């Protein structure tokens, strides 16, 4: 049975393990399951048009997860061919910059031995490895519903439904999709996954955790002047242009072929509803340091994705009746390192090993508490626990406290293996937003079309596409709240926090109305996270829709 009380009959396919999401976590789980038992039936469902189409990450990859999963990845041609050659960190002012010496940074912050990568390309390669082992990988298959057994345990998902009309009715070319049942179901949907969110709520997995915290990460791929390009150069910044308005910072990673990733992250616990994360990103590129790098270059692509930032304190239980949460579906990002892919891969491997052992014992559809224990007590938990104070110190006391006290906490963990305190996160990001009357409007420079770009122009470079005849996948719990609450109390922050220009208010006063341009959506999930009234619900559109990120 499904939670949706429809009378649609669907065919069912049976597997040992059903995995939702062809990201680093899901593909690692699939590979490890097949390594352990070549006869195990494993399927991976991916909502993107191809594997990697929806993958957006920095990324500087710590290969520890890949080393554990596929030790001979170098011989197999994994796309990790740009080792980090330099690593620097700056605090920016509007015109100047101050470098933080590497010597004062805790050793865990070093990127020595890491690689600048396109995680989309890494996932494409992982999918090839999985398919070579016999894993069935189905791109363009959006998992839209959970399937439960008579005991209320997760036993599968509904995937591949197409052809509903805009009003939700069944169209002429309707395809009901199918149910894919597994003895275990692994959810590797990434940040704020729609099915993951449901199981966290249904099974109260976050009962003993603090509210999850998030950031919105935006990224552009640039081709720059060869004279300015240094393969493997890694640079991070904090400070300007966010100042005291919000936490966050930038990353600048040099790949090969004169390509550079330019990214910007804004923590979503900001108070002032006039903060515009996207325009902050565009403003950042006009800093003299960035302008010098980008002048004469060309922006190639753009994307945006939410990031989990709660870490150790916000980690929910990762096992539930019938399945597990993988990677960022649970929240495994090490915030000061700006890395989560290594933990995602380690989580997939751990989930596969615990599921394999359970299946060998004849078990199925139970709660894999062994996996949750491994997440907390193994390498993932140790990685997150060591940096647990950085994000809450930043949120509660500002950048200086994060750099000094948070840095001291990391040094203590490095030297002594422990820190004497654990800071609390406090409010959710939605609850952190304050009424507009308590804040001043923030004026941002207009994009110049050379270094900086308006949202709609940039969204075209995400190569996003949605079938416009389908129902909008962005749902409102109450259609009146966007105007009555979002606009009248908070001055319409949805028109600013969305990095794709999905939301806008048309008209003024009593004539104001809320417009959802869902065809622009890049699936970042910021609206589902930051909406002060928690009135916007992100659901999955038809499979194959959304962004099509190349080399991102």
Task: Label each residue range with its predicted role.
Residues 304-335, 458-469, 482-497, 504:
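FAD-binding beta-loop-beta segment adjacent to the flavin cofactor pocket
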Residues 116, 329-342:
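Glycine-rich phosphate/pyrophosphate-binding beta-alpha loops
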Residues 17-43:
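N-terminal Rossmann-like FAD-binding beta1-loop-alpha1 element of flavoenzymes
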Residues 36, 47-96:
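N-terminal FAD cofactor-binding segment of flavoenzymes
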Residues 488-519, 525-548:
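Iron-sulfur cluster-binding cysteine motifs and their immediate structural context
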Residues 394-450:
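C-terminal auxiliary extensions adjacent to catalytic cores
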Residues 331-337, 349, 353-398, 515-517, ...:
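Active-site-proximal substrate-binding core of FAD-dependent oxidoreductases
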Residues 120, 124-125, 129-292, 350, ...:
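Predominantly flavin-linked oxidoreductase catalytic cores and closely associated redox partners
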């Amino acid at each position: 049975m499904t939670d949706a009380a429809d009378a649609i009959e669907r065919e069912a396919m049976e597997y040992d393990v059903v995995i939702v999401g062809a990201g680093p976590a899901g593909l690692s789980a699939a590979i490890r399951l097949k390594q352990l038992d070549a006869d195990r039936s494993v399927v991976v469902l991916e909502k993107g048009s191809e594997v990697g189409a929806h993958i957006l990450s920095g990324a500087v990859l710590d290969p520890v997860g890949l080393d554990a999963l596929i030790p001979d990845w170098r011989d197999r041609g994994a796309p990790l061919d740009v080792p980090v050659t330099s690593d620097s960190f700056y605090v920016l002012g509007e015109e100047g910059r101050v470098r933080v010496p590497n010597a004062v940074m805790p050793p865990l912050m070093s990127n020595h031995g890491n690689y600048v990568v396109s995680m989309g390309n890494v996932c494409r390669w992982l999918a090839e490895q999985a398919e070579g082992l016999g894993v069935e990988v189905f791109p363009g298959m959006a998992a839209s519903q959970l399937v439960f057994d008579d005991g209320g345990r997760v036993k599968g998902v509904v995937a591949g439904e197409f052809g509903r009309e805009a009003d939700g009715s069944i169209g002429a070319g309707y395809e009901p999709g199918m149910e894919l049942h597994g003895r275990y179901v692994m959810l590797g949907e990434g940040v704020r996954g729609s099915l993951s969110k449901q199981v966290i709520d249904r099974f109260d997995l976050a009962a003993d955790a603090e509210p999850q915290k998030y950031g919105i990460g935006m990224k552009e791929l640039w081709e720059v002047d060869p004279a300015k390009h240094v393969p493997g150069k890694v640079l991070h910044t904090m400070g300007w242009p966010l100042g005291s308005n919000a936490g966050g910072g930038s990353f600048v990673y040099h790949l090969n072929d004169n390509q550079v990733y330019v990214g910007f992250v804004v923590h979503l616990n900001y108070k002032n509803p006039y903060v515009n994360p996207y325009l902050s990103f565009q403003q950042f590129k006009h800093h003299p340091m960035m302008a010098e790098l980008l002048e004469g270059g060309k922006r190639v692509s753009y994307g945006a994705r939410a990031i989990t930032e709660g870490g150790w304190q916000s980690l929910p239980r990762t096992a539930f009746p019938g399945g597990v949460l993988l990677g960022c579906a649970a929240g495994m990002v090490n915030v000061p390192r700006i890395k989560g892919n290594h933990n995602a891969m380690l989580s997939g491997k751990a989930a596969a090993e615990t599921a394999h052992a359970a299946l060998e014992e004849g078990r199925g559809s139970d709660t894999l508490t062994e996996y949750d224990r491994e997440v907390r007590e193994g390498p993932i938990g140790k990685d997150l626990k060591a940096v647990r104070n950085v994000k809450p110190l930043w949120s509660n006391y500002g950048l200086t406290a994060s750099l000094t006290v948070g840095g001291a906490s990391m040094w203590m963990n490095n030297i002594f293996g422990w820190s004497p305190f654990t800071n609390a996160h406090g409010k959710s990001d939605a609850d952190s937003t304050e009424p507009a009357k308590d804040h001043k409007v923030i004026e941002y420079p207009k994009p110049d079309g050379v270094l900086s770009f308006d949202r709609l122009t940039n969204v075209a470079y995400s190569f996003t596409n949605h079938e416009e005849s389908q129902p909008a996948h962005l749902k409102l719990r109450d259609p009146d709240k966007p105007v009555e609450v979002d606009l009248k109390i908070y001055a319409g922050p949805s028109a600013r926090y969305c990095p794709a220009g999905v939301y806008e208010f048309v008209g003024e006063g009593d004539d104001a109305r809320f417009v959802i341009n869902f065809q622009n959506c890049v699936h970042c999930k910021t609206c589902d996270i930051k909406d002060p009234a928690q009135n916007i619900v992100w659901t999955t559109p038809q499979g194959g829709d959304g962004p099509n990120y190349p080399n991102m």
